[in-house]
């Protein structure tokens, strides 16, 4: 039986593009693990995707995951079928433009093959303590010097 894991993620950027950070909380039973990281020159969307990627990569075995993010970009790409259409259209949008962040989307596809992941949208900067903590982790990571 696969482990059931709950993950919250968030990304932040100081300027867009600019220095960025991501944060994630992984919860399994009573165990909570916090992870974070950043990049010196990036975008907010890359940090949102990186948070999900790093959290899913931290799982040592295939799991059933509920992943919560305040990123419409991430959640809608999965839940609204954008990602499937992009891959079917050789990484072109409906407007025939090249999809941004292909490298990260490919990693997400790889990880969602390994894990059974349900993506959920949460309201950012609201009363969700897990999302708020991930936001704090991401903002702290922005300020860290590599």
Swiss-Prot record:
Keyword terms: Cytoplasm, Endonuclease, Hydrolase, Magnesium, Metal-binding, Nuclease
Gene Ontology, cellular component aspect: cytoplasm
Q: Please state every residue range assigned to the domain named RNase H type-1.
A: 1-143
**Any idea which positions bind Mg(2+) 1?**
10, 48, 70
List the SUPFAM superfamilies hit by this protein, alphabetically.
Ribonuclease H-like (SSF53098)
Disulfide bond as a keyword of this entry, yes or no, is no
The cofactor named in the record is: Mg(2+)
Catalyzes what? Endonucleolytic cleavage to 5'-phosphomonoester
**Cofactor binding, per record:** Binds 1 Mg(2+) ion per subunit. May bind a second metal ion at a regulatory site, or after substrate binding.
Q: Which InterPro entries match?
A: RNase_H, RNaseH-like_sf, RNaseH_domain, RNaseH_sf, RNaseHI
Uppermost EC category: hydrolase
Pfam short name (any one): RNase_H
GO molecular function terms listed in the Swiss-Prot or TrEMBL record = magnesium ion binding; nucleic acid binding; RNA-DNA hybrid ribonuclease activity
Indicate the family of this protein. Answer: Belongs to the RNase H family.
Q: How does it assemble?
A: Monomer.
HAMAP family, per the entry = RNase_H (MF_00042)
What is this protein for, i.e. what is its function? Endonuclease that specifically degrades the RNA of RNA-DNA hybrids.
Instruction: State the protein's name.
Output: Ribonuclease H
Species assigned in the record: Chlorobium phaeovibrioides (strain DSM 265 / 1930) (Prosthecochloris vibrioformis (strain DSM 265))
What does the record give as the organism's lineage? Bacteria, Pseudomonadati, Chlorobiota, Chlorobiia, Chlorobiales
Q: Which gene encodes it?
A: rnhA
């Amino acid at each position: 039986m696969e482990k059931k894991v709950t993950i919250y993620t968030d990304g932040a950027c100081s300027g867009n593009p600019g220095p960025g950070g991501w944060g994630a909380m992984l919860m399994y039973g009573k165990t909570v693990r916090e992870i974070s990281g950043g990049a010196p020159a990036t975008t907010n969307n890359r940090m949102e995707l990186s948070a999900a990627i790093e959290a899913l990569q931290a799982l040592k075995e295939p799991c059933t995951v509920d992943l919560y993010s305040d990123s419409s970009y991430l959640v809608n790409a999965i839940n609204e079928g954008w990602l499937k259409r992009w891959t079917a259209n050789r990484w072109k949008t409906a407007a025939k433009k090249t999809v941004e962040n292909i490298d990260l989307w490919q990693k997400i596809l790889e990880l969602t093959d390994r894990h059974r992941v349900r993506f959920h949208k949460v309201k950012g900067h609201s009363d969700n303590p897990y999302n708020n903590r991930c936001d704090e982790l991401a903002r702290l990571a922005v300020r860290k010097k590599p």
